[in-house]
Amino acid sequence: MSLWSFAVFWFYLASFFVVGTLAAVLVLPFMAASLLFATGVVICGFFSNLSFRSAQLVYDQFVGTLQLTLQHMAEQVPPASDMQQPSGSTIDTGAMLAHTFDSSSYGATTQTGSGPESGPVPELGSEVSASPSPELAALPVAHKRSGRRTGTLASGM
């Protein structure tokens, strides 16, 4: 082995150790910080999942209670087919809608009586016909729902 080869070998070996040491000094702290932050992300993800699951459990427990409460509240609402006047007689809903669409002013209601059962009572006069107006007849007819309830209220948990 020549002297020149020997000097080049030591130069490359020293360069390798210097560059390796500088890289270790500069890179290893960033790698350690990266590992620390990655650990923090994993821990935060774990607690995020844990808090989501606990919130979902609380939500699932109260959904049934809320559905039952809403169902009981809905059962307390009187049917919308007939409206009670304060005198006790009923108003046909179709005639009331026909009056609403036939009248020139849509605010033709009066407030009579007092108490929770009194409300806006339409002024029904001779202009109300038994057949609905063309505007009302053009509206789509909603099919009457059966007595069996479907959907989220009846499905439970």
Swiss-Prot record:
The chain crosses the membrane at residues 8-28, 30-50. It is found in: Membrane. GO terms for cellular component: membrane. Its main location: membrane. Residues 1-7, 51-157 are cytoplasmic. The keyword Signal does not apply. Belongs to the OSW5 family. This is Outer spore wall protein 5.
